[in-house]
Amino acid sequence: MDALAGLSPRTRAWFTGAFAAPTPAQEAAWPAIATGAHVLVQAPTGSGKTLAAFLTGIDRLDRAPGAGLRLLYVSPLKALNYDVERNLRGPLAGLGSQLTVGVRTGDTSQKERRELIRTPPDILITTPESLFLLLTSQARDVLRGVETVVLDEVHAVAGTKRGAHLALSLERLERVVERPFQRIGLSATQRPLAEIGKFVGGGRPIELVDAGTRKALDLEVVVPVEDMRELGATSALVQPVLPDGVEMASGYEATTRSIWPSIYPAVLELVRAHRSTIVFVNNRRLSERLAARLNELADAEVARAHHGSLAREQRVEIEELLKAGQIPCLVATSSLELGIDMGAVD
């Protein structure tokens, strides 16, 4: 069966010109999505599942651009939203589409929010929290024409408090829209798939598309000291990293024993051995301290910190630096842990 059969000739022509062939996730997802049924697509990051969800929606909307907000995309991470908005530019430009795209997150200014209400885009990219705010204000009227809701990275919220709030928001949206909307869930490999499907469908029938494949993992545990009982002494310059809000106890001396003096050069060696590296840490304070220490050891800016407390413009700038190869390392919190397209990261 031709996976592109449900798309318009123009969309098929653009896709075949831009890509060699559909990915397995796209081949499995497009026929299911084309039926109008609720669908959950499970596939690993980089499998093209986001385009699988969007291309059918764009194809439908392109027949009547400017008719108001009809496609809603929800993801749990602001950085992912802006990444998706950038990645949509290619297909829309390639199709010569007049469809408009808006982003509504906690970073959106009041002026931009008013403009979204006054002139709703055809496609709105948002977060669960911003969707809740839209539904509990007069702005919910812009959602009446929604026909399709794409729920990305649903495995990250299913079974959590955020997931419960999102599920409630979707049911509220059902009462606002003019007719029932199609739900398309996108998930990384997660088991059991049926449970994630129940979350996406809200108890309604849903078609499960399992395009999950187990990737070959290259895992290595590295301990930068031969004997953990013989940690070197460290000065106050590299004092132990504490969680946010935790202060050093009184009586702490300038010299203590820590593994960090051995970790810093080991991480720097890995950074220098690769074109691009992302180091994940547990909190904002550690991301900033580790990036600063790497730069100090390298005597050059080789690393930048990335976390949710940075302004949106700063986060986007830092992400673009890594993508362009202008900086070899990002030290990030969970702000980059989901399926963001960072290009070729070694």
Language model feature labels by segment:
Residues 1-13, 21-28, 34-47, 52-346:
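Helicase motor core with emphasis on the C-terminal RecA-like subdomain
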